From Swiss-Prot:
Stated name of the protein: 4-hydroxy-tetrahydrodipicolinate synthase
UniProt keywords, alphabetically: Amino-acid biosynthesis, Cytoplasm, Diaminopimelate biosynthesis, Lyase, Lysine biosynthesis, Schiff base
Upper taxonomic lineage: Bacteria, Pseudomonadati, Pseudomonadota, Gammaproteobacteria, Alteromonadales
Family affiliation: Belongs to the DapA family.
Pfam families assigned: DHDPS (PF00701)
Biological process terms in GO annotation: diaminopimelate biosynthetic process; lysine biosynthetic process via diaminopimelate
Length: 294
């Protein structure tokens, strides 16, 4: 079972836009050293939308290589064309990922029937465990708990990342999907409550820059220690909101660069680097979270 503190890893890039694999290796080592429980490679935070498929597979493959079995790597396999998602899934099945994370098809707004057919087709193309991913704020489609429940019977669909921030869904998903179905928060601001309500883990943006504290918060919440989880979480709360002052992963990449975790904060168009008016806000939030800014 993959649970606990899972980082939605950024994809570091050089100033010319190419992937910076040296920085990627350092990031993987950093997270292993800090106790991160698993790594998601090339999800939303990893700029999946602007990496061509061949490059996408290479980044996931290299992440697996750098992790060297010390921490599970989950590969992003979402696409808005089912045929493309199937092709990507088949390629990722060959590189050693522990699981895959598939966002709902975006822009074309499938019905529940379409979502079910999409995920069944993707799951049928591999034996690797599949995690569904619902983030309607980015995809324009909301996969309701009732739709998720229709997919529980697919043997290699093992869980869902729920990123709406609607905590009522934790109880509803658990009721409909059973105790063995894995529930992951995709919203840092409500992650602590999500875990205390019975979630299994958090796939986090903030974890990129505060992995040790975030891991401690997750461990406390999973152990049912609400008071300790709150005390760890409180200094991080400003960070959770400020990391979304512009579209993810713009702020977190800038922050990682300021910390010296990556050599360059470059991000691919149509996203651009963090606006100057956000710099002070993010530095203030990082300082409150006891992050050293270089």
């Amino acid at each position: 079972m993959i649970n606990g503190s899972i980082v939605a890893l950024i994809t570091p890039m050089n100033s010319d836009g190419s992937v910076d694999f040296a920085s990627l290796e350092r990031l993987v080592e950093f997270h292993i050293d800090q106790g991160t429980d698993a790594i998601v490679a090339v999800g939303t935070t990893g700029e999946s939308a602007t990496l061509p498929m061949s490059e996408h597979v290479t980044v996931v493959s290299q992440t697996v290589k750098f992790a060297a079995g010390r921490v599970p790597v989950i590969g992003g396999n979402g696409a808005n064309a089912t045929s493309e998602a199937v092709e990507l899934t088949k390629s990722l099945s060959k590189v050693g990922v522990a699981a895959m994370l598939g966002v709902t098809p975006y822009y074309n707004k499938p019905t529940p029937k379409g979502l079910i057919a999409h995920y069944k087709a993707v799951a049928a193309s591999t034996d690797i465990p599949q995690i569904l991913y619902n983030v309607p704020g980015r995809t324009a489609v909301d996969m309701l708990p009732e739709t998720v429940a229709e997919l529980v019977s697919v043997s290699n669909i093992i869980g869902v990342k729920e990123a709406t921030g609607d905590l009522s869904r934790v109880k509803r998903l658990r009721e409909l999907c059973g105790d063995d179905f894995l529930l992951y928060s995709g919203d840092d601001a409500t992650a602590r409550e999500f875990l205390l309500l019975g979630g299994n883990g958090v796939i986090s943006v903030a974890n990129n820059i505060v992995p040790q504290a975030f891991k401690a918060m997750c461990d406390a919440a999973l152990a049912g220690n609400a008071e300790l989880a709150l005390s760890i979480d409180t200094p991080l709360r400003g960070l959770y909101s400020t990391l979304f002052c512009e579209a993810n992963p713009i702020p977190v990449k800038w922050a990682a660069h300021r910390m010296g975790l990556i050599e360059c904060g470059h991000i691919r168009l149509p996203l651009t680097e963090l606006s100057e008016q956000c710099h002070g806000l993010l530095i203030e939030a990082m300082t409150r979270a006891q992050i050293e800014v270089k």
